[in-house]
Amino acid sequence: MTSGKFDVCMPFIFREEGGFTKDRHDAGNWTGGKVGKGVLKGTNFGIAAKAHPELDVASLTQAEAAKLYRVEYWNACNCDLLASGVDLVVMDVAVNSGVRRGRSYRDATAPIRDAQKRVDGMSDKRRAFYKGLKTFSRYGKVWLGRVARIQAAATKMVLAGADKPAAAIKAELQARAAQAHAGAAKAKRQAAVAGAGSGAAATASVSTMPAPDQAAHPTVFLMLLAVVVGGIVVALLIHRARAHRELASAYAEVAAETN
């Protein structure tokens, strides 16, 4: 039974990790863990030369990679003991962000008995984590897409584990896609309103700016503060809209595959 759970989850992990890459600018592709240090061997099925300098990465088979994933991630996070769907999310967190974080998310959500709420909660934690990374502006879309696809796949597993018929599962996934789409539209509208307000505040702060000897006037400070806060709010709403769009797309895709 446990082997079956692992086998069900791995196609989703392999889909996200991809095949063989040998980008010399990626530190993970070097056996020394830094660009130019050691031998450039690359990454295959997500198994990197940095973590496994002893391997012939290029000739690694998917079956061999699966064995490594089972020991280093699946077993390390005790995924066999987790509910269907929850196991996939914890596994993907461990693979993409480290075993320590995978265990942390697993333990933090352990009190949540509802498997779907646990899947959603961990997925939200992932988005918040990625949003805080300095490289989010470059890789954010990729990360949010991955989180959404794993969340949607995990949701289907949860529903299937509840012995719901395919038609009911499809309907639930479609409903979630519609809900996420509506959430994206709402966040987009809110961002537009907040952006307009921030722009108005900026215009007002310039037009009402006092003489140079009064530059520290409280009114100027408050107006500038309003502009800064408005900009932060807009950025957060744009992030929310993007996350909802990715999730809507992922749910729609999984629903289309459900018959």
Map each language-model feature to its residues.
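Cell-wall polysaccharide-cleaving catalytic domain and substrate-binding groove, primarily
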Residues: M1-H217, F221-G230, L236-N259
